[in-house]
Amino acid sequence: MALPWRIRPGGLELRVRVTPRGGRDAIDGVEALADGRPVLKVRVRAAPDKGAANEGVRRLLAEALGLPASAVSLESGAAARLKTFSIAGAAEPLAAALAAMTGHAHP
């Protein structure tokens, strides 16, 4: 399976499928969409109201990667379940951390 992140200058680009009001804040692994695109499945307790769910995802990703919340920013999909986040930092260690937490081999 392809990976939902892509190395880019200054960090990573990460494709995420968000479930707001998911009962808990959690990263649930990688799945392929119907069109084959891989996404990181994330759920947050926050409702999709006034950006609360987006902020919840941003903070969850930062915490999981050991980064300050300011290192994670929403690039696209503010009002959609499918979102793209930009993660600033050393790309290789970030990719390795994502691979470890999702059980996927880092190329």
Enumerate the predicted regions with their spans.
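Residues within the alpha-helical elements of helix-turn-helix
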Residues: 64
